[in-house]
Each structure stands twice: as C-alpha cells, then as structure tokens.
Amino acid sequence: LKSMELNEKNYIRFQGTKSLKDYYKEENGNAVFDKSLLANVSFRKHDLVMGEVFNKFDLILCRNVMIYFNQTLQNEVLKKFHESLFRYGYLAIGSKESLIWCDYASRFIVVNNEEKVYKKIKD
C-alpha cells in the first residue's frame, strides 16, 4: 500500500475525477483493483521490429524501449504504432524519447511533453 501513496499523488496531478481509492480495496495489506477496470484492456507481448500490426488500440504504452533502436528502426516502429492506433488514440513513450524526427510527427499532437504523451490526429 505504500506505493499507492505515490500513485495517488500522480492521479491527483493528472486531475483524476475521483479518488484513486474508489478503484481499489485493501486486502491483506495489498491494493486489489476492481477487475472491471481491466474489462477492455489487453496486454500483448509483441516484437516491435518484426511483428505486424495486429489490432487497433486506443492507447499504446511503450516506455523507454525505442532509445535502444537506431533512428531508422525507431521510425519503422512509430509507423506501426501510428497504424495500430485509432484516430484520437494515445501513444506514451519514454521521457528521453521523442516524435520530433519521425516521419509521422505531423500526425500527432503533444498532450503532455514532460510525460511524452501524444494523441493521433491524422490517419
């Protein structure tokens, strides 16, 4: 539950509409989140380099991965992310990463530059 204090601060910082405590209950000293929160969430293991686009998503989280790729490979991965997002979907990348140099940069707007969150605005 100690880590939930930091999560609560982040939740408030990003202007959550309720209290974070509304989404979980304490059981045996642990925070157990309401299972309904995961009803529309899918976690996938995916090869960013060799894998093909396999679905459309509202949100893609890919933090601190692309810093290990050269610029050409980063651009290929961002192309796949672009193709995988619904219009107005969100992409969150690592704090040291950027879309500035990307061929697809004009198809996204910055939602939060500090946290590197982008919104797809063009197909």
PLM regions: where:
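Extended basic-aromatic, gly/pro-enriched interface segments that bind polyanionic ligands
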Residues: L1-L59, V65, L73, L99, ...
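ABC-family nucleotide-binding domains
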Residues: N70
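A short glycine-rich, Lys/Arg-flanked "PGG" loop and its adjoining helix->strand segment in the class I
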Residues: N75-R87
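Conserved beta-strand signature within the Rossmann-like core of class I S-adenosyl-L-methionine
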Residues: R87-S95
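Short secondary-structure junctions
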Residues: A105-V111
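Short hydrophobic/aromatic beta-strand or adjacent loop that forms the aromatic wall/cage
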Residues: N112-V117
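Flexible, glycine-/basic-rich loop-and-beta segments that form/coincide
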Residues: D123
